[in-house]
Amino acid sequence: VNFQPWFFVVIKGEKGCNHIRQCYDREWFRSAPIYILVCADHRSSWIRKSDGKDHADIDVAIATEHICLAATEKELGTCWVCNFDTDLCKQLFNLPNGVEPVVIVPIGYPKEPEVFVSTPKRRKAFNEIVKWENF
């Protein structure tokens, strides 16, 4: 099944950039020269018959990560932004009913590596996330 239930709004003009920055107002976010608003089109998504699960979010996540990987290959920086005002986003970008804004991907050239301050991240141990044969 290849329903492709996604929609991409590429934002690079002044008006669009101002709109997207209203939806997620962070200093680092404002410096991006281009954004992609990735939306799930629930009107055309695949629904699993056994339990009614709408797979639009899963398909959108796969497409978004491919965008991020392609940008990285071109030495561009990206970030998944999911904690934004989705209602305002729907309004400002005139999204139709059934089309949900899922993630904003700002894209730009990253700062030089020495500018970043690295903070250690706790990662779950392998045996916390992988089980063999059974949960």
Predicted regions and their residues:
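Small-aliphatic-rich amphipathic alpha-helix that forms the alpha element of a beta-alpha
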Residues: 36, 51-92
